[in-house]
C-alpha cells in the first residue's frame, strides 16, 4: 500500500475493508476472550490506517512503532471507511464477500446490487477477484482492479483450479463533478 501511494502520489486515498480483514476479525473473535476482544479494533486496517501499532519481535526482544499510515504521507488525505464499499463522486469502490468465477461476473453482480441501492453512479471498481478487467454496460463502466500483492507467495488457492491472479491496479480519473473520465482512466498491469 505504501509503495502504491508513493507511486501514484494521490491527493486522497479511501481504504475499504475486504474479506482478508473480515477473516482476521473472525479469527480474533473465536480465539480471544470477550474482554480481550474489546481491546482490539474490528480489523487490522484500523491499526494500520488510524491508530498505529507496535511490532513485537520476541526473538530479539525489541519492539518497533509503526505510525498510522494516514500520518506518513504529508498532503495525502488517507482514511479507512470501515465498510466493504464507499462512493466517491459517481464511482462506487467495493470489496464484496461474494465471488463468481466467470470473467467480470462478480462486477456485474455488484452493479446489479448497487443499482437497487443507489442508481446514481457511472463507474464501479471492484476488488476481491484479484483480476484485471473492464467493460461498459449501458451508462456504467465496470472495473475489476487486480491486486498489488506478491501473488507468487499466496498459496491459498493452490489446487482449486482457479484462474491465475492478475497483478495491477486501476488509475481512475474523475472530473470536478465526480464523473468518470474514461479516456484518462487506465488499468495498469505489472
PLM regions with names:
Residues 97-188:
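Conserved beta-sheet core of the metallophosphoesterase superfamily
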Residues 2-123, 147:
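Conserved catalytic scaffold of divalent metal-dependent phosphoesterases
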Amino acid at each position: 500500500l505504501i509503495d502504491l501511494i508513493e507511486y501514484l502520489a494521490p491527493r486522497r486515498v479511501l481504504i475499504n475493508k475486504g474479506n482478508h480483514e473480515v477473516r482476521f476479525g473472525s479469527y480474533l473473535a473465536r480465539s480471544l476472550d470477550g474482554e480481550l476482544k474489546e481491546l482490539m479494533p474490528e480489523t487490522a486496517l484500523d491499526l494500520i490506517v488510524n491508530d498505529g501499532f507496535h511490532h513485537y519481535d520476541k526473538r530479539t526482544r525489541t519492539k518497533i512503532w509503526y505510525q498510522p499510515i494516514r500520518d506518513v504521507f504529508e498532503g495525502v488525505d488517507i482514511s479507512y471507511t470501515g465498510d466493504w464499499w464507499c462512493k466517491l463522486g459517481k464511482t462506487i469502490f467495493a470489496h464484496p464477500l461474494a465471488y463468481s468465477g466467470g470473467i467480470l461476473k462478480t462486477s456485474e453482480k455488484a452493479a446489479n446490487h448497487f443499482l437497487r441501492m443507489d442508481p446514481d453512479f457511472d463507474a464501479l471498481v471492484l476488488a476481491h477477484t484479484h483480476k484485471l478487467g473492464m467493460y461498459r454496460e449501458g451508462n456504467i463502466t465496470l472495473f475489476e482492479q487486480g491486486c498489488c500483492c506478491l501473488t507468487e507467495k499466496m498459496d491459498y488457492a493452490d489446487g482449486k483450479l482457479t484462474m491465475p491472479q492478475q497483478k495491477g491496479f486501476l488509475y481512475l480519473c474523475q472530473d470536478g463533478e465526480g464523473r468518470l473520465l474514461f479516456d484518462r482512466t487506465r488499468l495498469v498491469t505489472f
